[in-house]
Each structure stands twice: as structure tokens, then as C-alpha cells.
């Protein structure tokens, strides 16, 4: 039986749609009355694990799920040993550096050395600032990261940005982009090597459906 790790929240609906195109019907997870965290597919040949976004690559890396769908932001932050197979293209957003609009900074390299940068994505932030050779002090926050520059706890933030509305409403602007994040299909590497063909079939269908939607 194939097990697929699915993230609760923004990725879930599109993930279910894409998997249905590959013959895995997990529409039951979208039922608002559903309280199950392990949900069988309609055909009974697969099951879905409903987990937090950040836990998807963990379940896949440890082999408790053969496949998973997760944002590239989480993959980059977690750095788990999984196979990143298909860019599914939905739920796109930017991982950006932002500062107060009144700060005068217009590029990350203009930030002062050893300034504080707040983020939920400290691994991504650390790699970015190392790449531009700017030493910073990272402050790990788990929510409302925009408050960092407003309260003075940090000079800048690194966070996901979709429309930019929240930044604008809080007087912040983007000054650099780390990468563009979209949903990715990932797999457990050993499961891929031992695959009898079923996993590869799902992967190929999801790749082709992504290519078709892009045309």
C-alpha cells in the first residue's frame, strides 16, 4: 500500500486534486467533518497521512510515507534526505528579505554587519547571508515575523511573501529574494529504488499533468 504524506492547510486542496489525476482519490480528507489523520483512498490501495507542513519531509525521509507533497520552502529549511521529484507549480510564493520602508535599505547587502534578522526559516536565512558574505544575528520567531522590524527586535526579516499585502500594511518592503517556492512532489529514496512500477507511474502522471497545466 502506498502512503502519501499531505500537509494540512493551503497545499491540501490542490494536492488532493493532483493526486486524483494520478488515480489516488483522497477527497475524503477535504470533508470538514473528517477527524482522521490517516485516511484511506477511495479504492483502498493507498492511504494519506495528514500532518503539519514541516513534518511532511520528515515522514518521507524516515520511510513512513513513500510520497509527499510539500512546499520548496520547507524542503530548503529542513534539508531532509528525500528525492525532490516534480515541481507541481501551485501555491507559489517568494522567500524574501524585508525591512521597514523608511529604513532606506534597498538591498540585503546594504544591511549593517551583525544586524539582527528575524525569521521562521533560519536555515534558509543563514545560507543566504553566508552566500552574500554578510554576518548577521538570526532571531528565530514562529509567527508574526513582521513585528520584528516594527518592535526593534530585528533590522530585517526573512519570510514567505505571496501578494505582499501583509508587508505593505505593516510598513515593510521587500529588498531581496532568496528563491521562489512552489509545491513539490517528494519521495523516499529507498522506496523509489525498490519500486515495482506503481510509484513511477504516479510520478509520471503528476509530471505530465503539471506540464499540461503549464501550457
Swiss-Prot record:
Gene3D superfamilies: Periplasmic binding protein-like II. GO terms for cellular component: cytoplasm. Its main location: cytoplasm. PROSITE patterns: ATP_P_PHORIBOSYLTR. Keywords: Amino-acid biosynthesis, ATP-binding, Cytoplasm, Glycosyltransferase, Histidine biosynthesis, Nucleotide-binding, Transferase. Its EC number is 2.4.2.17. InterPro entries: ATP_PRibTrfase_cat, ATP_PRibTrfase_CS, ATP_PRibTrfase_HisG, ATP_PRibTrfase_HisG_short. It catalyses: 1-(5-phospho-beta-D-ribosyl)-ATP + diphosphate = 5-phospho-alpha-D-ribose 1-diphosphate + ATP. Pfam families: HisG (PF01634). Pathway: Amino-acid biosynthesis; L-histidine biosynthesis; L-histidine from 5-phospho-alpha-D-ribose 1-diphosphate: step 1/9. It comes from the Bacteria. GO terms for biological process: L-histidine biosynthetic process. GO terms for molecular function: ATP binding; ATP phosphoribosyltransferase activity. It is found in: Cytoplasm. Heteromultimer composed of HisG and HisZ subunits. Catalyzes the condensation of ATP and 5-phosphoribose 1-diphosphate to form N'-(5'-phosphoribosyl)-ATP (PR-ATP). Has a crucial role in the pathway because the rate of histidine biosynthesis seems to be controlled primarily by regulation of HisG enzymatic activity. Lacks the C-terminal regulatory region which is replaced by HisZ. Belongs to the ATP phosphoribosyltransferase family. Short subfamily. PANTHER family: ATP PHOSPHORIBOSYLTRANSFERASE, ATP PHOSPHORIBOSYLTRANSFERASE ATP-PRTASE. This is ATP phosphoribosyltransferase. It comes from Prochlorococcus marinus (strain SARG / CCMP1375 / SS120). The gene is hisG.
Amino acid at each position: 500500500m502506498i502512503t502519501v504524506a499531505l500537509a494540512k492547510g493551503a497545499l491540501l486542496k490542490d494536492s488532493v486534486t493532483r493526486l486524483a489525476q494520478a488515480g489516488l482519490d483522497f477527497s475524503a480528507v477535504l470533508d470538514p467533518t473528517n477527524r482522521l489523520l490517516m485516511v484511506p483512498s477511495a479504492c483502498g490501495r493507498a492511504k494519506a497521512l495528514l500532518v503539519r507542513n514541516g513534518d511532511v519531509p520528515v515522514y518521507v525521509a524516515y520511510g513512513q510515507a513513500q510520497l509527499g507533497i510539500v512546499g520548496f520552502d520547507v524542503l530548503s529549511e529542513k534539508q531532509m534526505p528525500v528525492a525532490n521529484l516534480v515541481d507541481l507549480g501551485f501555491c507559489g510564493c517568494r522567500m524574501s528579505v524585508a525591512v521597514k520602508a523608511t529604513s532606506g535599505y534597498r538591498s540585503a547587502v546594504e544591511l549593517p554587519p551583525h544586524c539582527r534578522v528575524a525569521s521562521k526559516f533560519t536555515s534558509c536565512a543563514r545560507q543566504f547571508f553566508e552566500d552574500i558574505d554578510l554576518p548577521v544575528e538570526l532571531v528565530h520567531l514562529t509567527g508574526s515575523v513582521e513585528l520584528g522590524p516594527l518592535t526593534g527586535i530585528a533590522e530585517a526579516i526573512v519570510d514567505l511573501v505571496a501578494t505582499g499585502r501583509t508587508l505593505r500594511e505593516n510598513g515593510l518592503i521587500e529588498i531581496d529574494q532568496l528563491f521562489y517556492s512552489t509545491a513539490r512532489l517528494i519521495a523516499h529514496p529507498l522506496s523509489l529504488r525498490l519500486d515495482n512500477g506503481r510509484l513511477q507511474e504516479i510520478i509520471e502522471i503528476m509530471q505530465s499533468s503539471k506540464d499540461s497545466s503549464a501550457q
